[in-house]
Amino acid sequence: MGDVNIWMIVGFLLAAYSVVANDSLQTLGTYISSNKTRTPKVVQMGFICSVTVIVLMLGFFLNDGDPAWGRLEKFELPEPFGWVYVIPPIAVLALTQWGAPVSTSFLVLSSFKAANIGKLLGSSLSGYFLAFALGLAGYGLGMWLLERWVFRRTQEGKDFNRVWYGLQWVSTGFLWSMWLVQDLANIFVFLPRKLDVFPMAICTAVLCVGLCFLVASGGGPIQAVLRSKTNTSDLRSATVIDFFFGLCLFYKAFLSTFPLSTTWVFLGLLGGREIALRIKEQEFEYTFTNRESGNLGKIIGSDLWKAFIGVVVSLVIALGIQPLLSCLLYTSPSPRDRQKS
């Protein structure tokens, strides 16, 4: 493990909190929403933290001390590591409070190596269209029947089979593990690429504390992205969403070790799903989609607009950090100059 300075630690802590507050809500949001009144929060915390520890330890031991699952190979640790690199996670926190489904991959990783922005964009766009196509095809060809049934059962106040509890926990565990494989790079990019056992244990504890806080708070502003979609607070619908989302991340994870924006995958899946449900709904005389949040264009457009703002902010920060860093290095005396003086 290389030398660690205070800015690396601050950056890691801010990233751990901001990435968990933003990205993981897109992954655990359906789980948190549907279990809010059904499962004790302590049990939820134990389940999520257990999956987290398993994935972290697997990545650590299988990749020779690299908990990011090899996704930082093309993102070297900057030398020197200054305070400017803590700007991205602070920006993530600000955008999260606004309720923007910002891509932490763009905002954080591109700041470390702006040359990779194009590849990040291409990888994320392919993930978006993959998820959009899966949502459109899956719900358009058959899953709309489940959503119509769920909507009508909910309106009638009928309960559901307990088997759905087990199915949802399985799908959530699968999705959460795939998200960790993809997005741990956004957190560990602030630390040396190889960690020793003790620092790794501390990092794991920090992440688990953040996840417990997430569950205790019951979500955040990003939950609005979910609430505007059909049946997303229903355990049965959430189970299917989690499974489809996990499949997309699983496919992308083993197709390439290069990072992508899981946020865009999430938005693509929900967008394709909502369009398919609205199209099928036109064949019937009654509605079975969420109309409280406005028409389809407003819902999808709002998500894409906020995501676009996040990308613009990401690019501004990523392209601005390197000149700022160069300026600071130019005006600051080197260690050799300080010794001479």
Where are these regions (language model features)?
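Alpha-helical transmembrane segments and immediately membrane-proximal extracytoplasmic
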Residues: M1-L329
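Conserved small/polar residues in nucleotide/adenosyl-binding loops
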Residues: Y330-D337
